[in-house]
Design a protein with these regions (language model features):
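M16/MPP (pitrilysin/insulinase) zinc-metallopeptidase core fold and M16-derived inactive scaffolds
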Residues: 48-110, 153, 288-304
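His/Glu-based metal-binding/catalytic segments typifying zinc-dependent metallopeptidases
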Residues: 39-41, 48-50, 234-291
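Boundary at the C-terminal end of the N-terminal hydrophobic targeting segment
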Residues: 18-20
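N-terminal targeting signals for Sec/Tat export/insertion, comprising classic cleavable signal peptides
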Residues: 27-53
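Charge-rich, well-structured scaffold segments of protease-associated domains
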Residues: 84-234, 251, 301-302, 306-439
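Sec-dependent N-terminal signal peptides
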Residues: 4-15
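Short acidic-hydrophobic surface loop/beta-edge motif
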Residues: 24-30, 250-254
Length: 439
């Protein structure tokens, strides 16, 4: 009982924090805005940047360019060698990371307040004067090719690759963000420089910060170091993806003790009026861990899997509903049948009042736990800003969830959970699996 009251107190404390989350929008150049939550409890600052320049814009024949560029930016810049650059970061407790998704080129900066000037100077060097020495390029190429080679042996990586090939055939999202092995050796220094010069443009930049930094300070740094990225060049765009999903089962036969199962169907956009209905529905169906319907039916009642899950996934150019499970080869047919059955049940009958109440309670009370550090707050600000939402989202978010009704869930389920538009991918050696497409 004591633990319960401690937990309840913590939830209420965080709830008050969420309500008081004061998000400032700073207009620092033309139409560019940064979001900031000032928190001077600790002398720490977290800043997140995102350019719309992920691996999805990699040119044909140079797949992996965005990722390789990100990997090389801290491998020497200005007059610093790779070793010297990393040492000055470490000596001053500065974390500076570059990485990419299919849609975005991310920069994470985490530093003590007293080292803000130095942090931005080093970030500026990395973005404007990377050395791109041949020795470092070749080393990073070797690392990337090794990871890609190993990915063809790992069942999880195989599943992800084949899943993308089915869902995103003939689209840039089809490829791993690391690229394609045969393209890696084709990438030269001039390609890396061209990527930076042509794609990291302020028109496609999002910025979010949390910690011991004031509005005027953040604006000063952004104007000083990022206005120069107003290069007015035409940035490569990822094409829209249109995929008609059919009711199919794909099999990649592999001699494994267990089979991996992935499935996917129609998704929903972030600005759809029924997005929160889909969000709550997914939690009840397969996003709620041990409390979801899929876990109850497939694991708890029948003991067929260790875990089973579902989620809503969003790319800039495509949205989909997906999920997966792992089970013994002899139980694959059973698991697929149960998953399909549960999707149909929610589509036809919806969910119960109790399920809806429990889902709302969890989704509301757990949200604040995702905002318990400057890094997490900055990440949440960045993602919310990139979703095209306003700074008052954090005040309204819980109301959006509370407003979801049983009828709303039935309506959105009828759109998303169409058994005729969901495919399954199995990797393993399943028994008695019929009507399959081998890949």
């Amino acid at each position: 009982m004591k633990k319960f009251f401690i937990f309840l107190f913590f939830i209420l404390l965080n709830f008050n924090y969420l309500s008081a989350l004061d998000v400032k929008e700073i207009n620092y150049y033309k139409d560019n805005k940064a979001w900031l939550v000032n928190d001077n409890n600790l002398p720490i600052v977290a800043i997140k940047f995102a350019f719309k320049a992920g691996s999805g814009i990699d040119p044909i024949g140079k797949k992996g360019l965005a990722s390789m560029t990100a990997s090389l930016l801290d491998e020497g810049a200005g007059n610093y060698s790779a070793k010297e650059f990393k040492k000055i970061l470490a000596d001053n407790s500065i974390t500076l990371n570059f990485n990419v998704s299919h849609d975005n080129f991310y920069i994470d900066l985490y530093t003590l307040k007293e080292n803000l000037d130095l942090s931005f100077q080093l970030l500026d060097l990395a973005l404007t004067k990377p050395t791109f020495k041949l020795e470092e390029i070749n080393r990073i190429k070797g690392n990337i090719k090794l990871v890609l080679k190993q990915s063809y042996k790992d069942p999880n990586d195989i599943s992800a690759r084949l899943f993308r090939e089915i869902l995103f055939k003939d689209h840039p999202y089809q490829y791993d963000t690391l690229g394609v092995s045969e393209d890696i050796d084709k990438i030269e220094k001039k390609d890396l420089e061209s990527f930076l010069n042509n794609n990291l443009t302020i028109e496609k930049l999002f910025v979010a910060a949390s910690g011991d930094i004031k509005e005027a300070e953040l604006k000063k740094y952004l104007k000083k170091y990022f206005v120069k990225f107003d290069n007015k060049k035409k940035v490569n765009e990822i094409p829209t993806h249109k995929k008609n999903i059919n009711s199919e089962i794909f099999l990649h036969k592999k001699d494994l003790r267990q089979s991996s199962i992935l499935f996917a169907g129609k998704g929903i956009s972030r600005n759809d009026p029924y997005f929160y209905s889909a969000y709550v529905m997914n939690y009840i169906l397969g996003g709620g861990g041990f409390f979801s319907r899929l876990t109850t039916e497939v694991r708890e009642k029948r003991g067929l899997v260790y875990s089973v899950y579902s989620y809503l996934y969003r790319y800039d150019k495509y949205n989909f509903f997906s999920g997966g499970a792992q089970t013994s080869n002899e139980n694959v047919v059973k698991v697929i049948k149960i998953i399909k059955g549960e999707l149909i049940k929610v589509k036809k009958k919806g969910v119960t009042e109790e399920e809806l109440k429990n889902a709302k309670n969890y989704l509301i009370n757990s949200y604040v736990l995702r905002l318990d550090s400057n890094n997490k707050v900055a990440s949440m600000l960045l993602n919310t800003q990139m979703d095209g939402l306003n700074t008052d989202f954090f005040e309204k978010r819980n109301d959006y969830i509370n407003s979801v009704s049983l009828e709303d869930i039935k309506k959105v389920a009828s759109r998303i959970l169409d058994e005729n538009q969901i495919f399954f991918l199995v990797i393993g050696n399943p028994i008695d699996l019929k009507n399959i497409n081998k890949i």
